Amino acid sequence: MSNLITIERHILEQQKFFPDAQGELTDLLNDVAFAAKLVRREVVRAGLVDILGFTGSTNVQGEEVKKLDLFANEKIISAIGQHGRFAIMGSEENEGVIIPPKNESGNYALLFDPLDGSSNIDVNVSVGTIFSIYKLKGDDPGKASLSDCLQHGYEQVAAGYVIYGSSVVMVYTTGHGVHGFTYDPTIGEFLLSHENIITPKSGKYYSINEGSYAQFNEGTKRYLDYIKEEDPATNRPYSTRYIGSLVADFHRNLLTGGVFVYPPTTKHLKGKLRLMYEANPLAFICEQAGGRATNGRDRILDIQPLELHQRTPLYIGSVDDVILAEEFEQGIR
């Protein structure tokens, strides 16, 4: 980071790939980066203020809402919505779409998970924000609707995530490579730290919640048994790395190589992760870094969303490792 490239400067340089955007993309991503700074400020001091624990309510997913979840959601909506650059938004925490007060001038839709892995915040484990940006289908922002949010993943114009951990890292793509930035609190800026991230074609790590083993189908069980067997010729056994925070598990595997698997279970036959808030943005990033992302059979970015909170299985990471998991899921092995 000796040349100190800020995220704002980097986004401006990326703007050349979008001559028709007239600077809008720069403003959109800067808005997201600003909102991330606000969330980061509270995450790092969460144990010092009354922001840990549950609110006593549940969100649209049926999950208990944590105070920091609610705070992050409100901050992102207010910080981003006030500038009028997004005509419509969707959050994992809100049942329906969100229409910002100044939406008449916005030409984009924002979908986001305000605080992924928030169940870990009480024990100081990394959490994160995931976001996805789409261009509106129509020309009138005042008529933005749910259909503008229910676009294929391949129609994203930008996607990214922010990890709040020992350091704060923001990773994003606009379809021209994947770039990571580390927050420097002394100057209040995200500085380029990981340029043109390329994920290894194969890795030695797998991330899955094996506590749900009894609920997995036979293909998933055979896959897990296979990757634990000793066979130096195929680099087995794999090592497990599972934090329970999707964005943190994904980020590690993106850099080191490996696969994250959240298969269907008897409890969640259609999968548990959200297509629009989690799978699509991470799949866009993963493919841009040379990886692969599917639901075990179909490419994530090709799935036609039917509802805002649609769920999906997810197999994402290094190409060879994802294909291996798919072969067991499909009964090829």
Curated annotation (Swiss-Prot):
Pathway noted in the entry: Carbohydrate biosynthesis; Calvin cycle
Domain of life: Bacteria
Binding site for substrate: D116, G117, S118, S119, N209, Y242, K272
GO terms of biological process kind: fructose 1,6-bisphosphate metabolic process; fructose 6-phosphate metabolic process; fructose metabolic process; gluconeogenesis; reductive pentose-phosphate cycle; sucrose biosynthetic process
Keywords linked to the UniProt accession: Calvin cycle, Carbohydrate metabolism, Cytoplasm, Hydrolase, Magnesium, Metal-binding
Gene Ontology terms: cellular component: cytosol
Protein's recorded name: Fructose-1,6-bisphosphatase class 1
Organism of this sequence: Pelodictyon phaeoclathratiforme (strain DSM 5477 / BU-1)
Biological classification of the source: Bacteria, Pseudomonadati, Chlorobiota, Chlorobiia, Chlorobiales
Gene: fbp
